[in-house]
Amino acid sequence: MSGYSAPRRISDADDVTSFSSGEPSLDDYLRKRALANHVQGGSRCFVTCRDGRVVGFYALASGSVAHADAPGRVRRNMPDPVPVILLSRLAVDRKEQGRGLGSHLLRDAIGRCVQAADSIGLRAILVHALHDEARAFYVHFDFEISPTDPLHLMLLMKDARALIGD
């Protein structure tokens, strides 16, 4: 995308102080925990910048989901719990929203998940949407809603591959 850096791993040199997505929990995560979680191996955080300032980010972590919480296509022929990769956070600064950056970051995250699935067993990508608007964003990208929580959504790895043209 024009004007934005390619998503890359967060570093201590990144300016996150003015980041404001409109979601305090996401802003606080980026400012207070993203780098430490990244360094300590709890998650991997990727940022994109404009003019030297972080304007978007996402975080990935390993996880699992119980059969009862997974849509039928996700749990079919899988162990319980089902191995997944968790897209734990995704946010765009308010000043950059509405320009396609969120979609770009999601596609980048999906691409990294597909690469990971080539090396380890992963059935799906799991997200915990914060609210109905976020859920609609993920549904637009073919994420399926959990039968037990309408804000938990999953994307099968085969659908992820199709989405990014892999």
UniProtKB/Swiss-Prot annotation:
Chain ranges of the N-acetyltransferase domain: 1-162
Phenotype caused by lack of the gene: The tacA-tacT operon is non-essential and can be deleted without an effect on growth in cell culture.
Highest taxon above the source species: Bacteria
InterPro entries: Acyl_CoA_acyltransferase, GNAT_dom
Pfam families: Acetyltransf_1 (PF00583)
Function field: Toxic component of a type II toxin-antitoxin (TA) system. Overexpression of this gene alone in M.smegmatis inhibits growth, while overexpression of the tacA-tacT operon does not. Acetylates glycyl-tRNA(Gly) but not other tRNAs, blocks in vitro translation in the presence, but not absence, of acetyl-coenzyme A. Peptidyl-tRNA hydrolase (pth) counteracts the product of this enzyme in vitro. Neutralized by cognate antitoxin TacA. Does not seem to be active in laboratory growth conditions. TacA-TacT both represses and derepresses expression of its own operon.
Protein name in the entry: tRNA-acetylating toxin
Organism, scientific name: Mycobacterium tuberculosis (strain ATCC 25618 / H37Rv)
